[in-house]
Design a protein with these regions (language model features):
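A conserved short coil-to-beta-strand element within the FAD-binding core of flavoproteins
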Residues: 1-10
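Short hydrophobic core segments
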Residues: 11-23, 157
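Generic recognition of long tandem-repeat/solenoid scaffolds
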Residues: 8, 77, 140-142
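Active-site substrate-recognition segment that forms the wall
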Residues: 22-137
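Generic beta-strand structural signal
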Residues: 1-2, 15, 39
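C-terminal catalytic lobe of FAD-dependent flavoproteins
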Residues: 108-175
Length: 175
């Protein structure tokens, strides 16, 4: 598929990098990015409760992935992932699933304080792989990382740096 012609809003730039997540298709129509909702919880340790774990815990409960990330004051538990348009409100079902799964892995979390429920939208591609590369001679894309955005940030930064330095020139093949 040949990508559409794109005129960057900043015309004096030599190269434009599209890194605007779920809204990338607004700047490059046809880019196969869709929003996927994700929820996480922050659980605060309370006096008398079992201590915060010392390491990240990853598990699978009832076919769902759950992770527990230790923080100074408690644990971040996550995460859901499902198609729900552009809704960014935490849903009771998502919160319940995370709590059930987290407590199945570490039952003592049931006594922690539920400090925060948060939801956001992740840019996802049809094949689940990020789009990082040239779209045309003046436009790079760095989007579609899904739930692994923070994890892949160092790789993406290095890849974009290499592309800008001219070390790699192949164009992204869009489905």
């Amino acid at each position: 598929m040949t990508p559409p012609t794109f005129t960057p809003p900043v015309t004096d730039a030599d190269v434009t990098v599209l890194a605007n997540g779920i809204d990338a298709p607004a700047l490059w129509p046809g880019l196969p990015i869709r929003p996927v909702k994700g929820e996480i919880l922050r659980l605060r340790w309370r006096k008398g409760c079992m201590p915060v774990p010392q390491r990240v815990i990853r598990a699978r409960v009832h076919g769902r992935q759950v992770y527990l990330v230790p923080r100074a004051d408690g644990v971040v538990a996550g995460a859901t992932q499902y198609e729900h348009g552009r809704d960014t409100a935490p849903a009771v079902t998502g919160v319940r699933d995370i709590l059930d799964d987290a407590c199945a892995v570490m039952p003592a979390l049931g006594e922690y304080e539920l400090a925060e429920c948060a939801a956001g939208l992740r840019p996802m591609t049809p094949d689940g792989l990020p789009i990082v590369g040239w779209l045309d001679d003046r436009t790079l894309a760095a989007t579609g990382h899904g739930r692994n955005g923070f994890l892949l940030a160092p790789w993406t930064a290095q890849r974009i740096s290499d592309l800008l330095a001219g070390d790699v020139k192949e164009k992204v093949a869009l489905c």
